[in-house]
């Protein structure tokens, strides 16, 4: 019993790290190679175009190149993010399948309990084959979940998963799944521990708060025994939503930090967001956008607004006078028109709000300015006096080499636009290496426990064969 218990705990831990290692390898391949081309190439091409622009800002060739590279940058970023999201869906499918498998095992255990009890109740026969089959199921369950088991004097086995009764007294308390309407992600929960309301058609709507099978907010560590079971590893890796840069904000980061896929989605989106907003801000400054409080005609004051006077003939402006943006949002405008207390019209930059996805410059809401795609020379880079705007072109170049960005709030090292993606991939590779080494150590532990267990439980084939020969000779 002790060796069974040890073996099952260690094999559950082994599966946790096996899944975690596979997830890291998949994420690394998503980041490294997409249709044979790494995103780093796209980033390097964009950086090269910015350097070319700084050499000859008013050339229609360099302006055309930067718009083209910006467009590729957005397309490739979308493809990487879509790949990560698709992998979340893949994990979600595996989670569904494994919950179904666990429930199937639970019902099989009930049947085997009944059969074993029936055979052994007389106290003469021993249901060895049935016990072997039951042990096999317990081994499989132990790989998927953090389970414990006990056998009563009648030969029936009870099982707990994550400390909650799963098989007990002739009942299998099946795990149910609640599907998130926005993402389709499922959360395994215990129906007997959840409250519910009943619809008119008789279907139940569950409130699963506190009834989840796994508490994913607890820190993962071997000391706490929270690193056991392949299903938990899948749930952690998938996360509970599609993350973006707002998830990396101080105070929010803990909710995504333990999920490999959400963490990378957030860090990758943050990189794209930083590049996009920095470039737009540099162009806005050239167009005369300033920061400060703006008093409006209706008596209200916009605090810390970014705004400029409406000036359709101004430098770095569109026909309607809005400051030119290289990157625009798909769902909302970059600027809105307001009337100031002085009676003049102003363009005010629309602020990003974390709780309003359509206001954000995130990967799913990004495009290159369609007017610039058609006519890159709108960028101009020629000031009112006819001179080249070298200052703005140089500012764009400098933006790529400023060491002022971190991957996430827990990382101290500052990085640049040029190196950010490489650092991101290295972080995944390093984490993957750590998971793999833990997994390999764990495999050795499982094998050692299994061989000790077999010495006690298993009969060697040689021994079995010689017993059969003895038995035949006796006839």
Regions found by a protein language model. Give the residues of each.
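Structural signature of extracellular appendage/secretion-system components
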Residues: 1-475
């Amino acid at each position: 019993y002790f060796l069974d218990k040890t073996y099952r705990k260690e094999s559950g831990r082994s599966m946790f790290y096996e899944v975690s290692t596979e997830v890291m390898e998949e994420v690394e391949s998503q980041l490294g190679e997409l249709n044979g081309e790494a995103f780093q190439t796209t980033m390097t091409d964009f950086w090269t175009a910015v350097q070319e622009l700084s050499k000859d800002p008013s050339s229609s060739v360099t302006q055309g190149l930067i718009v083209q590279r910006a467009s590729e940058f957005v397309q490739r970023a979308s493809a990487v993010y879509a790949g990560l999201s698709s992998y979340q869906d893949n994990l979600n499918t595996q989670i569904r399948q494994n919950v179904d498998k666990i429930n199937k095992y639970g019902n099989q255990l009930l049947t085997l309990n009944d059969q074993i009890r029936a055979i052994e109740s007389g106290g003469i026969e021993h249901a060895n084959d049935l016990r072997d089959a039951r042990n096999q199921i317990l081994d499989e369950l132990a790989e998927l979940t953090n389970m414990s088991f006990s056998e009563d004097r009648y030969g029936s086995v009870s099982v707990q998963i994550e400390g909650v009764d799963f098989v007990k007294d002739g009942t299998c308390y099946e795990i149910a799944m609640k599907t998130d309407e926005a993402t389709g992600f499922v959360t395994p929960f215990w129906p007997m521990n959840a409250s519910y309301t009943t619809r008119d058609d008789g279907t139940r709507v569950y409130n699963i708060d506190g009834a989840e099978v796994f508490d994913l907010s607890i820190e993962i560590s071997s000391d706490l025994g929270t690193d056991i079971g392949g299903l938990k590893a899948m749930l952690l890796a998938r996360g509970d939503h599609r993350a973006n840069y707002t998830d990396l904000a101080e105070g929010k980061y803990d909710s995504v930090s333990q999920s490999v896929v959400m963490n990378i989605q957030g860090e990758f989106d943050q990189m794209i967001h930083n590049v996009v907003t920095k470039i737009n801000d540099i162009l806005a400054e050239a167009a005369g956008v300033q920061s400060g409080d703006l008093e409006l005609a209706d008596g209200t004051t916009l605090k810390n607004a970014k705004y400029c006077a409406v000036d359709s003939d101004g430098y770095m402006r569109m026909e309607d006078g809005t400051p030119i943006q290289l990157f625009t949002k798909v769902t909302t405008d970059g600027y809105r028109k307001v009337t100031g207390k002085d009676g003049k019209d102003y363009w005010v930059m629309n602020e990003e709000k974390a709780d309003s996805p359509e206001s954000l410059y995130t990967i799913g809401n990004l495009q290159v300015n369609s007017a610039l795609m058609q006519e890159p020379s709108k960028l101009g880079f020629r000031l009112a006096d006819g001179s080249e705007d070298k200052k703005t072109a140089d500012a764009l170049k400098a933006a790529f080499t400023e060491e002022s960005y971190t991957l996430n709030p827990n990382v101290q090292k500052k990085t640049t636009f040029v190196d950010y993606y490489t650092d991101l991939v290295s972080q995944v590779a390093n984490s993957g290496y750590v998971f793999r080494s833990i997994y390999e150590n764990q495999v050795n532990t499982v094998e050692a426990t299994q061989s000790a267990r077999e010495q006690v439980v298993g009969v060697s084939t040689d021994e079995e064969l010689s017993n059969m020969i003895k038995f035949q000779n006796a006839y």
